[in-house]
Amino acid sequence: MTELKAKGPRAPHVAGSPSSPKVGSPLPCSQAAGPFPGSQTSDTLPEASALPISLDGLLFPRICQGQDPTDEKTQDQQSLSDVZGAYSRVEATRGAGGSSSRPPEKDSGLLDSVLDTLWEPSGPGQSQPSPPACEVTSSWCLFGPELPEDPPAAPATQRVLSPLMSRSGGKAGDSSGMAAAHKVLPRGLSPSRQLLLPTSGSPHWSGAPVKPSPQPAAVEVEEEDGSESEDSAGPLLKGKPRALGGAAAGGGVAAVPPGAAAGGLSLVPKEDSRFSAPRVALVEQDAPMAPGRSPLATTVTDFIHVPILPLSHALLAARTRQLLEDESYDGGAGAASAFAPPRSSPSASSTPVPGGDFPDCAYAPEAEPKDDAYPLYGDFQPPALKIKEEEEGAEASARSPRSYLVAGASPAAFPDFPLGPPPSLPPRAPPPRPGEAAVTAAPASASVSSASSSGSTLECILYKAEGAPSQQGQFAPPPCKAPGAGGCLLPRDSLPSTSASAAATAAGAAPGLYPALGLNGLPQLGYQAAVLKEGLPQVYPPYLNYLRPDSEASQSPQYSFESLPQKICLICGDEASGCHYGVLTCGSCKVFFKRAMEGQHNYLCAGRNDCIVDKIRRKNCPACRLRKCCQAGMVLGGRKFKKFNKVRVMRALDAVALPQPVGIPNENQALSQRFTFSPSQDIQLIPPLINLLLSIEPDVIFAGHDNTKPDTSSSLLTSLNQLGERQLLSVVKWSKSLPGFRNLHIDDQITLIQYSWMSLMVFGLGWRSYKHVSGQMLYFAPDLILNEQRMKESSFYSLCLTMWQIPQEFVKLQVSQEEFLCMKVLLLLNTIPLEGLRSQTQFEEMRSSYIRELIKAIGLRQKGVVSSSQRFYQLTKLLDNLHDLVKQLHLYCLNTFIQSRALSVEFPEMMSEVIAAQLPKILAGMVKPLLFHKK
């Protein structure tokens, strides 16, 4: 853009001089007829002092006396077409009349002369009235219930506007042009909206009555349409200018002499004939004006708060219609207290409120608010706070914070850029977060309607203060800390900050949770409510609306670390690093156990073998530490069966509910018992689960064999089958009492019993033979004991030799009763179907637990770690070898069952069903044996 410079200084305009145009006087122009039918103008109107000199001749060309305002509209369009770089085409028409000084030209002389006036500040002796101060620092005037009436607001406005008046030696009234030059008109209004200032003698609206000079004039926002006349039935804006009651009834005039008082500008929406969205009219009211400002300049200044968004009129109309379908605004005292700062004193009412919710310039204090008094841009909500739009993104960050009257909360409002902060601010707090509705704390009549209460569960308070009491309700505003405590309780670090927020913080005001932002270097957008989301840039991340509330996070296990199981080393109590050698231990105990086992150290305790092993004193006594490792079940072979047992934290299965009450000793009490450990003395401590297994061991079962008769093959096999039937019933009863077995599916329980009943019976045979006759004979039952001679006389001598291997292994290994009990349970869990069990996870957990119990049972008697590992290998190897041994028994049993009639051998009913249903599957390889070691 070409830079425009002034040619030179001009002579100051002297008010009252007939030869030069006066400040704000209309410019002369030709009497060319416009395309629109003109209306009568008044020749007796005084000079329009409210016209800003900065725009004199550039955007607002002076008109001749008697010229129709529509002619002026046409000429304004011609002059605006020659000015490049204008943000919007805005025409302001005033009352016709006055003398003319020069016609509008298209050469550079006009621009230079206008720029000379534009860049000259006002002098100290010349001033013009200005509208109230709240229009300068507060948000756009469309959002306001009342107008502050106190004249003391003018000096505060001059202090706030002082940064804008930096040049010295100016002329009267130029400050308004300077302020207008710094402001950017909304693109939503450009180029289809203009400001038309009708005269008091000729109304711009069809059917409007002619008002006298004291009646307030109206400025209406119209669509720029050259094809329609203003008197036609189809203009975009129709209706009468709304004169407000109360103090505004006898308000000022549209154009007054420099010494007269003019009313402030107010906005009254008007309904359109084609669109339901209200159009905005500017109405002047009675209020003192600050020197050096004109109403139109203030209007242009206030338009900076409109969001610069390319919003179509159809979308705006649809959005406004949606908002206006709610309850009509019930204004009055409740509304004033709900949306405006308290007006208890003149100083409070005249204090400028930066970023306030609703500046007091919509209607007079005594006037009843209009039913359609909703602004065109935004969700102006009634006191019921029917907030239907979630504010997110730039719309929540760019708008000025809503004012909350929270007791004890520090002010957290931000002045509009680039104005400095005012001397005093009412206490206010920012909205909780994007997407969350805010409720004022002052009025008792404010309530949340059903429209807002139907929101998502994310709509709740995220940040709570410690000192200020939180307001009741779902959408209560978050109070900040007490004044002087600095920022809010939980500032959002991820959100960008601005210089305005930093300045407010330095000035003593606490920054809001979401400071106002300046987008792309433009001034901050100070509009008050949500606009359409589709036209807003995504400043905040989209996941902000998905933040969990603190109340929900504290109740959810995902956010509560206390609900997670704490991994502690079972040896020293330190933090466990994993499962090492079959036990959940730390890295230190893992290395200690490995070195002690490989080095075969003979540690001796200097005390009584009861030293405390914890995180601090674990290195004091290696003997007690190694003993504790063995008691916990650490063995070198733990890695070999890790893939089978899926080792987890030690679990006491005695907590499982049993079908019949069984006295289970407390493990903590058992561990608290003192025990001694020495090379010549065994540990006198039995784990509680092993004690439980011992208590549920079946009683002695008799075979019912008649020893008085000579043995025959059929009689022996029949007696063995009868014994097997009784033992099968005993296995079913024992398994039901087994801790953890009832947790499996009922089908899995039946399958495991049918697959393992032969293994359990032959394993029990070996234990009884080892225990009662030291493995010298086969002790089937007290009434059926086969020695080697009887074995040879039987028809199944080879089978007896196979079964005889088990007690011999028991004798060789010197198996203890605790080891036998654990191995017996593992035999029950040693064979599963190829497709797995229904409750496979519970089965694996149960099997892993009993493997651990076997390790404990081994550690009860073994004095060294190496011997414990070797013994675990030997015992598990014995369990693996039983698969081949039992397969021989299955084959013989099935053959005998098939030839039972020929052999005259009786098979009981239950045993017959098991043999017929399961033995063919087992022999066909349709089962999966679980092995501890690879073959």
UniProtKB/Swiss-Prot annotation:
Entry keyword set: Cytoplasm, DNA-binding, Isopeptide bond, Lipid-binding, Lipoprotein, Metal-binding, Nucleus, Palmitate, Phosphoprotein, Receptor, Steroid-binding, Transcription, Transcription regulation, Ubl conjugation, Zinc, Zinc-finger
Region entry Disordered, spans: 1-50, 62-159, 185-252, 331-365, 415-452
InterPro entries: NHR-like_dom_sf (IPR035500), Nucl_hrmn_rcpt_lig-bd (IPR000536), Nuclear_hormone_rcpt_NR3 (IPR050200), Nuclear_hrmn_rcpt (IPR001723), Progest_rcpt (IPR000128), Znf_hrmn_rcpt (IPR001628), Znf_NHR/GATA (IPR013088)
Region named Modulating, Pro-Rich: 1-568
UniProt motif LXXL motif 2: location: 115-119
Molecular functions (GO terms): nuclear steroid receptor activity; sequence-specific DNA binding; steroid binding; zinc ion binding
Region (AF3): 1-164
Entry GO CC: cytoplasm; nucleoplasm
Compositionally biased region (Pro residues): 418-434
DNA-binding region: 569-641
Modifications made to the protein after synthesis: Phosphorylated on multiple serine sites. Several of these sites are hormone-dependent. Phosphorylation on Ser-294 is highly hormone-dependent and modulates ubiquitination and sumoylation on Lys-388. Phosphorylation on Ser-345 requires induction by hormone. Basal phosphorylation on Ser-81, Ser-162, Ser-190 and Ser-400 is increased in response to progesterone and can be phosphorylated in vitro by the CDK2-A1 complex. Increased levels of phosphorylation on Ser-400 also in the presence of EGF, heregulin, IGF, PMA and FBS.
Cross-link (Glycyl lysine isopeptide (Lys-Gly) (interchain with G-Cter in SUMO)): K388, K533
Region of interest (AF1), residue spans: 456-548
Feature: compositional bias, Acidic residues: 220-231
A Pfam cross-reference name: Hormone_recep
Motif (Nuclear localization signal): 183-187
Compartment annotation: Nucleus; Cytoplasm
Short motif LXXL motif 1, span: 55-59
Top-rank lineage group of the source organism: Eukaryota
SUPFAM superfamilies referenced in this protein's UniProt entry, alphabetically: Glucocorticoid receptor-like (DNA-binding domain) (SSF57716), Nuclear receptor ligand-binding domain (SSF48508)
Zinc finger (NR C4-type): 569-589, 605-629
Residues joined by cross-link Glycyl lysine isopeptide (Lys-Gly) (interchain with G-Cter in ubiquitin): K388
Biased composition (Polar residues): 191-203
Family classification: Belongs to the nuclear hormone receptor family.
Function, in words: The steroid hormones and their receptors are involved in the regulation of eukaryotic gene expression and affect cellular proliferation and differentiation in target tissues. Transcriptional activator of several progesteron-dependent promoters in a variety of cell types. Involved in activation of SRC-dependent MAPK signaling on hormone stimulation.
Protein name: Progesterone receptor
Species the sequence originates in: Pithecia irrorata (Gray monk saki)
Top-level taxonomy: Eukaryota, Metazoa, Chordata, Craniata, Vertebrata
Gene: PGR
